[in-house]
Structure formats: C-alpha cells, structure tokens
C-alpha cells in the first residue's frame, strides 16, 4: 500500500485552551473552512469542550477526540475519565502519551500501553505520541528510543486493533517551541516507526498504518512535511486554534 491509499489524518490538539463558549465559536469557523477536505479531520479538545464539539460537528466531516483517557473502566479514580465515558459522548479519537503528559504528569511508556489498550477496548482510536528530547537526538539515540516507545505502547495490541491506531512522531524539542524537525528528519523517524510496526505485525500492516508528524507544524511548513512518503498527517498544536491556519494545513494534507 502506497501513501496515496493510506488515510491522511490532520488532528488538532487544543491542549488546555478554549472555554466551552470559545470552542463553540472556533468549531463554527472550522466547519466551513474544512468542509472540502480530502483527508480526515479531527479536533482533540479539553474534556469541558467535548459535548460542544460533538454537537456542533454532527453531520460534518470533522471527528472529535479527547486529549487523554484513564486505563480503568470505572472506579475510585478522582478526576479521571474512562474510554466508555468518552465514547458515550460521541468521541472517536484520543491522544495518548503526549510529551506534555510525559513531562508534567508522570506518563510512562507502560501507562501509555495501558491507556492504549483501554482506549481500543472502549472503542476509541488512539493517537499514540512518541519522540525524543534534544539531548537524546544529539546523542544519536532517536531511532532506538522511538522503536522502544512504539514496541511498549503496542504490547498486547492485536493486528486487528492496530487498524484503529495512529502513531504521531513528535520530537519533544519541537513541541511549542516554534522549532520544527526538517522534512527529512521527520521522514526518517516516521519511516523508522513504520519499520518497527512491520517487524511486529508484518509489512502490510505497516504500510496501512497512519503515521503523523507533530511538532510546530504550521501553514508555512506543512506542505513540505506532508509531501514525504511516510508522513501521513499531522498532530497540530498552536495552529489548530485558528480556523484559517488549520484549514491551510488540511489543504496541504489533501495535496500531499
């Protein structure tokens, strides 16, 4: 399967931005801006915006995702949200293992794996984030590290479940910094992700996998990044908070 046959996915990660009323305005702007998209469009919002996002995107081509999910179905886990709670709202995707979760909230490769399996069991499509720090890149261990992150994240995930998994390469040094991996750097790691998935699940499964790049993708660099053969989409931070900028990236994915 070549790139043209894979599903390109542009997912906005709003992070801790937008109140419910602000979200309503942004979604109203997004709907017409991306209605002709030739790729799948996802917006991953704070929990407090999910109901608004789901209601306002009904009947449109925009899918809704959450930014995290707990690995238990229910119980005494104050402040947490389960996969069943999200799917009951109409949420389809969930971001798992974002570098900010790893940095600030003690996320580990093992908890990423637990969340991934819980998300899949609950009917969600996980967007699993992997990536290296600047120090790790300078040490030359990027590929080794990312391979390990992918292997642990997918431990216990079946080949059938893999069809609902997206993996996003997000170099930590490019998250929220304005720095971006070059298109060649992004391609190199996205290809390595596809290679390790091939070793685990076979070549056909690897060729079918959607691999995103996340890390300060914006209207200026999106087309070059998305033109690479192993970059199938983007996990977009800051640019997803402005409808016009997000739409430019969606258009670039359609071309790519």
Question: Which residue ranges define each predicted feature?
Answer:
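Active-site loop-to-helix "anion-binding N-cap" substructures in soluble metabolic enzymes
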Residues: 1-256
């Amino acid at each position: 399967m070549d790139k043209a046959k894979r599903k390109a996915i542009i997912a906005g990660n709003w992070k801790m931005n937008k109140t419910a009323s602000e979200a309503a305005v942004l979604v109203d702007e997004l709907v017409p801006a991306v209605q002709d998209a030739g790729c799948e469009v996802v917006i991953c919002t704070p929990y407090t915006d999910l109901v608004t996002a789901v209601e306002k995107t009904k009947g449109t081509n925009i899918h809704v995702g959450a930014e995290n999910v707990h690995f238990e179905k229910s119980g005494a886990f104050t402040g947490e949200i389960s996969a069943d709670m999200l799917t009951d709202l109409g949420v389809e995707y969930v971001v798992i293992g974002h570098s900010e979760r790893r940095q600030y909230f003690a996320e580990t490769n093992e908890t990423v794996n637990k969340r991934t399996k819980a998300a899949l069991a609950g009917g969600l499509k996980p967007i699993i984030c992997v990536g290296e720090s600047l120090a790790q890149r300078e040490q030359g261990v990027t590929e080794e590290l990312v391979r390990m992150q992918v292997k642990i994240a997918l431990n216990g995930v079946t080949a059938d479940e893999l069809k609902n998994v997206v993996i996003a390469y997000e170099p930590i040094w490019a998250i929220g910094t304005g720095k971006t991996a070059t298109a060649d750097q992004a391609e190199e790691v996205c290809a390595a992700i596809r290679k390790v998935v091939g070793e685990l699940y076979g070549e056909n499964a690897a060729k079918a996998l959607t691999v995103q790049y996340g890390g300060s993708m914006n209207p200026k660099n999106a087309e070059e990044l998305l033109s690479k053969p192993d970059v199938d989409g983007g996990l977009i931070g800051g640019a997803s908070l402005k409808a016009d900028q997000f739409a430019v990236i969606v258009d670039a994915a359609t071309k790519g």
